[in-house]
């Protein structure tokens, strides 16, 4: 399984599938189509049935049941795109066999080093086979590791018909990183009772709570006058924007929060005297706190409108997704089986809230309860991203074990 999973994963990451929030197409980038076509061919080649790809790049496939029992159909999902924040072009994966616990030189020429001093969790990977970047791109383990693990699990089950299982559905989706993953996902066509996204990080991660999420866009209009004659006339839109930002609680930002704490995050600040635009994301696990955060932003905007004139400030807030716990708690079995699968394989499940969202956050509200399980990756979305092949194999085995447990319990 080791060589098979390395081969799959390193092949996928070499396709640039960075998504683009400024694109209106689906998928948002042509690279995602390139990978999608490869995956469709591979699904057919390993023997999956009902392999389809729709006009929006959503891939679905079936592993038919080989048992007479009435087993609920379950699904596994992973996303094809990589994060827009860091380049995914010309990824050159590097394989570190039997990691010794010391610094890993990612790029000698550029002096880029993956060091346990900066990333102490590297100590957990002594003796593992790691896959890293060459220091100039992200790796794309988020979420091509999930694709490789699902594909390898399906190939294994097809090669081992003695393992009894119900019907399994698989989906590979576009544009998760820009929050659009499930927007055009056909839950009815997928036809699963439960699903799992294989989109988590380190070994043992099992997540069924996500943020409630919104984005806020605030536009400030100023009045530009020659600075030499500006007294009493100029209105500097950037200064109003700074005033807005200064009224948000400084300690409620990503760099000061953890666990169940929510935040306001200023993503971009673009402006000049005449016009400035702020773009925020708002996150909280608690629904009431989430609503209070949005209200706080509107309140600050209203105060500044009073001070500078209503026409000078426009605020728009849009909800993006909600905490999936509300939809998963009532069908707790979907989490319990994943927990048991890990325990059966001597993996300690680590249940924690996702300080982010997955496609599962939205799918759970679309009628498909979808918790998230680990891939084995670390440091997603940047040049220090890496993954343990040993833990990729464990993730693959967890997928197989979940499928076996659903059949055994039917």
UniProtKB/Swiss-Prot annotation:
GO terms for molecular function: metallopeptidase activity; tripeptide aminopeptidase activity; zinc ion binding. Its cofactor is Zn(2+). Cleaves the N-terminal amino acid of tripeptides. Zn(2+) 1 binds at residues 79, 142, 199. Binds 2 Zn(2+) ions per subunit. It is found in: Cytoplasm. It comes from the Bacteria. The active site is at residues 81, 176. PANTHER family: PEPTIDASE T. Belongs to the peptidase M20B family. PROSITE patterns: ARGE_DAPE_CPG2_1 (PS00758), ARGE_DAPE_CPG2_2 (PS00759). The lineage of its organism: Bacteria, Bacillati, Bacillota, Bacilli, Bacillales. One of its GO terms (cellular component) is cytosol. Keywords: Aminopeptidase, Cytoplasm, Hydrolase, Metal-binding, Metalloprotease, Protease, Zinc. This is Peptidase T. Zn(2+) 2 binds at residues 142, 177, 381. Its EC number is 3.4.11.4. It catalyses: Release of the N-terminal residue from a tripeptide. It is an enzyme of class 3 (hydrolase). It holds the Pfam family M20_dimer. One of its GO terms (biological process) is proteolysis.
């Amino acid at each position: 399984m080791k060589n098979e999973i390395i081969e799959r994963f390193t092949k996928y990451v070499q396709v640039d599938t960075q998504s683009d929030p400024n694109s209106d197409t689906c998928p948002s980038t042509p690279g995602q189509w390139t990978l999608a076509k490869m995956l469709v061919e591979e699904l057919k080649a390993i023997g999956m049935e009902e392999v389809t790809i729709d006009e929006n790049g959503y891939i679905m496939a079936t592993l038919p049941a080989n048992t007479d029992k009435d087993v609920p159909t379950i699904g596994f999902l992973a996303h094809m795109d990589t994060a827009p924040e860091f380049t995914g072009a010309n990824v050159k994966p590097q394989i570190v066999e039997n990691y010794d616990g010391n610094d890993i030189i990612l790029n000698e020429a550029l002096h880029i080093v993956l060091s346990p001093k900066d990333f102490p969790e590297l100590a957990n990977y002594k003796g593992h086979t790691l896959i890293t970047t060459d220091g100039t791109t992200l790796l794309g383990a988020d979420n091509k590791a999930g694709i490789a693990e699902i594909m390898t699990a399906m190939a294994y089950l097809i090669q081992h018909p003695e393992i009894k299982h119900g019907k399994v559905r698989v989906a590979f989706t576009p544009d998760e990183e820009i929050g659009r993953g499930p927007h055009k996902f056909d839950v009815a066509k997928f036809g699963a009772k439960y699903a799992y996204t294989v989109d988590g990080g380190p070994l043992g991660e099992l997540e069924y709570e996500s943020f409630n999420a919104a984005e806020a866009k605030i536009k400030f209009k100023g009045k530009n006058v020659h600075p030499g004659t500006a007294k009493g006339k100029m209105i500097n839109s950037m200064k109003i924007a700074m005033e807005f930002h200064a009224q948000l609680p400084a300690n409620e930002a990503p760099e000061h929060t953890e666990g169940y704490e929510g935040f306001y995050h200023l993503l971009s600040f673009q402006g000049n005297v005449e016009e400035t635009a702020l773009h925020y994301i708002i996150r909280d696990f608690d629904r009431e706190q989430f609503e209070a955060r949005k209200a706080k932003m509107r309140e600050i905007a209203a105060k500044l409108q009073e001070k500078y004139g209503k026409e000078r400030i426009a605020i728009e807030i849009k909800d993006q997704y909600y905490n999936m716990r509300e939809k998963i708690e009532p069908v707790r079995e979907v989490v319990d089986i994943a927990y048991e699968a890990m325990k059966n394989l001597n993996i300690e499940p680590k249940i924690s809230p996702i300080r982010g969202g997955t496609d599962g956050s939205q799918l759970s509200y679309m009628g498909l309860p979808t918790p998230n399980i680990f891939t084995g990756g670390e440091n997603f979305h940047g040049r220090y991203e890496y993954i343990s092949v040993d833990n990729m194999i464990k993730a693959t085995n967890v997928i197989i074990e979940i499928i076996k447990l659903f059949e055994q319990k039917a």
